């Protein structure tokens, strides 16, 4: 039975939670690592954009993740970065959320994402030291794509490691 498409972050978080509770089984490791499904890391600015507006490509990527159209890779340092940024008072106010809803959203995001253990630290590679954890998650997780709204800071490192940089809209279009 098709569900109504959620139109804000709170509704999407709840829909993701219902999906997870309804299925009660997570896909096997083999199923999660299918070579036909692109592996990507979402930069923090993509999640911030999704939290601020349900109208853009960043928010649409969350639906694509929910529908398993790509594998989102996340490491512990990157998850902590997501939480720190999404819980900032100015981010909560901009997205009309509270800290509890941000944490619930990230809890569900963790259920859908594939964890990456950072075996190698490649620092320094990016123009902004705060972006290193994003790049390291992509490299250690075998991502094909790093999805960001800030391609400039990653451009040289991405070229060195043959990592595709795409904005949310470009990545969404590449999913078909």
Show which residues each predicted segment covers.
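Acidic, PIN/NYN-like endoribonuclease modules and their adjacent C-terminal/linker elements
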Residues: 2-20, 27, 132, 139-145, ...
């Amino acid at each position: 039975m098709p569900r109504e498409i959620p139109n804000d972050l709170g509704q999407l978080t709840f829909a993701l939670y219902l999906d997870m509770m309804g299925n009660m089984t997570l896909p096997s490791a083999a199923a999660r690592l299918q070579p036909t499904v692109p592996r990507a890391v979402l930069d923090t600015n993509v999640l911030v954009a999704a939290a601020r507006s349900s109208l853009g490509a960043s928010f649409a990527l969350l639906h694509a993740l929910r529908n398993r159209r790509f594998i989102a890779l996340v490491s512990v340092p990157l998850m902590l970065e997501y939480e720190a940024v999404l819980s900032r008072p100015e981010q909560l106010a901009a997205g009309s959320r509270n800290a509890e809803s941000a944490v619930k959203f990230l809890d569900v995001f963790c259920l859908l994402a594939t964890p990456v253990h950072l075996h190698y630290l490649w620092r320094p590679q990016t123009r902004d030291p705060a972006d290193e954890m994003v790049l390291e998650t992509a490299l250690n997780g075998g991502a094909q794509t790093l999805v960001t709204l800030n391609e400039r800071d990653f451009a040289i490192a991405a070229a060195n490691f043959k990592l595709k940089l795409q904005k949310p809209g470009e990545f969404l279009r590449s999913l078909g």
